From Swiss-Prot:
One of its GO terms (biological process) is thiamine diphosphate biosynthetic process. 1-deoxy-D-xylulose 5-phosphate binds at residues 161, 187-188, 209-210. It comes from Halalkalibacterium halodurans (strain ATCC BAA-125 / DSM 18197 / FERM 7344 / JCM 9153 / C-125) (Bacillus halodurans). It is an enzyme of class 2 (transferase). Its EC number is 2.8.1.10. Catalyzes the rearrangement of 1-deoxy-D-xylulose 5-phosphate (DXP) to produce the thiazole phosphate moiety of thiamine. Sulfur is provided by the thiocarboxylate moiety of the carrier protein ThiS. In vitro, sulfur can be provided by H(2)S. GO terms for cellular component: cytoplasm. It is found in: Cytoplasm. One of its GO terms (molecular function) is thiazole synthase activity. This is Thiazole synthase. Homotetramer. Forms heterodimers with either ThiH or ThiS. The gene is thiG. Its main location: cytoplasm.
Length: 259
C-alpha cells in the first residue's frame, strides 16, 4: 500500500506526531522534546495562554522563531457554549483558526461529553474553524462529528492521562474503516507499544502529552514515540499476516532431505 501525505484543513503535514506542551519539567526540556519529536502540530489549553499578548505568553514565547501549526484546545469547557466562546477568543487574538474541541463534565474521568462536543463542532465548523474534536471511541459518534464538519476526528484510546493504552481496538479499527477524514488517536496512551498498536490499526496520527512529559526521560520518550509512529505506520502499510488458529510451517514438509 502506498502512503499518502497527511492533510488536515488544507495543510499538508510531514509528521504524524501531534504534541502537547503542558506538564514538562521546564521549558528547556519542552523545547528539546519538540526538536527530537519533529512534531509540526503543537496543542495547549487556551486557558493557560495570555490572549491579550500571545507573543509574550510564558508558553508561546519559548517557541518564537520556529514554525508550527498551533492547535489550541478548549480544555476546561463544560458545555458547547463555553467551548465556542473560548475558540472565538483564540481566533480573535490571532492565535489560530485550528481548534481542538475538548468538553468534559466529569473531573474524575475527563471523558468527553458527546452531545456538547457534537454541538460545538457543528457551530465552529460553520464559522470556518478547522475543528478537531476530542471524542470517545464510538464509531457512530465519530461519523457524526465528521458529518458535522470536523477536519479530523480524535478518539481517545483511554481516559486522559491514564496510560491504559488502546482499550477498544475493535472500535478504533471500525472508526478508521468508516472515516473520510483523518483519525488522530488522542489520550490514554502510555508507551511506544500503545502507539504502534494505534498506527497499525490505521490511525493517521497520534496526539500525546502526558506519556512524554511525565516520562522519567521525556526527550528519550519523545524519540521513542516518534519511531513508534513511523514503525506502526509502515507496518500498517506493509500489511500484517492474517491471524489463524493453527500453525503453518515456514518450510513445507516436502523440502525435508531424504536419505
Amino acid at each position: 500500500m502506498k502512503d499518502l501525505p497527511l492533510s488536515i484543513g488544507g495543510k499538508t503535514l510531514t509528521s504524524r506526531f501531534f504534541l502537547g506542551t503542558g506538564r514538562y519539567p521546564n521549558p528547556f526540556v519542552q523545547n528539546e522534546v519538540i526538536r527530537v519529536s519533529e512534531a509540526e502540530v503543537l496543542t495547549f489549553a487556551i486557558r493557560r495562554v495570555n490572549l491579550q499578548a500571545p507573543g509574550e505568553d510564558a508558553i508561546l514565547q519559548h517557541l518564537e522563531g520556529k514554525t508550527f501549526t498551533y492547535l489550541p484546545n478548549t480544555s476546561g469547557a463544560k458545555n458547547a457554549e463555553e467551548a465556542i466562546r473560548i475558540a472565538r477568543l483564540a481566533r480573535a487574538s490571532g492565535l489560530s483558526d485550528w481548534i481542538k474541541v475538548e468538553i468534559s463534565v466529569n473531573e474524575r474521568t475527563l471523558l468527553p461529553d458527546p452531545v456538547e462536543t457534537l454541538r460545538a463542532t457543528e457551530t465552529l465548523a460553520n464559522e470556518g474553524f478547522t475543528v478537531l474534536p476530542y471524542t470517545s471511541d464510538d464509531p457512530v459518534l465519530c461519523k457524526r462529528l465528521e458529518e458535522a464538519g470536523a477536519a479530523a476526528v480524535m478518539p481517545g484510546g483511554a481516559p486522559i492521562g491514564t496510560g491504559l493504552g488502546i482499550l477498544n481496538p475493535y472500535n478504533l479499527g471500525l472508526i478508521v474503516e468508516e472515516a473520510n477524514v483523518p483519525i488522530i488517536v488522542d489520550a490514554g496512551l502510555g508507551s511506544a507499544q500503545d502507539v504502534v498498536q494505534a498506527m497499525e490499526l490505521g490511525a493517521d496520527g497520534v496526539l500525546m502529552n502526558t506519556p512524554v512529559a511525565k516520562a522519567k526521560d521525556p526527550v528519550k520518550m519523545a524519540l521513542a514515540m516518534k519511531h513508534a509512529i513511523e514503525a506502526g505506520r509502515l507496518s500498517y502499510l506493509a500489511g500484517r499476516i492474517p491471524k489463524k488458529r493453527y500453525a503453518t510451517a515456514s518450510s513445507g514438509l516436502e523440502t525435508f532431505i531424504s536419505k
